[in-house]
């Protein structure tokens, strides 16, 4: 029998400043993958992480 998937899901975090910023260090969009608990965190994640394209700490939001 197959097990159910559980409450932990894999989500993708994308930099919010990479889309609008034109004076970046390099081209592209910074993306990270992480896991979140579906029961404890029902809303979308917003985490400050390092963006190598902007060369600074920026807010990364969960995308679908």
Swiss-Prot record:
It comes from the Bacteria. Gene3D superfamilies: Ribosomal protein L33. GO terms for cellular component: cytoplasm; ribonucleoprotein complex; ribosome. One of its GO terms (molecular function) is structural constituent of ribosome. Keywords: Ribonucleoprotein, Ribosomal protein. InterPro entries: Ribosomal_bL33 (IPR001705), Ribosomal_bL33_CS (IPR018264), Ribosomal_bL33_sf (IPR038584), Ribosomal_zn-bd (IPR011332). One of its GO terms (biological process) is translation. NCBIfam families: PRK00504.1, PRK00595.1, rpmG_bact. Belongs to the bacterial ribosomal protein bL33 family. This is Large ribosomal subunit protein bL33. It comes from Synechococcus sp. (strain RCC307). The gene is rpmG.
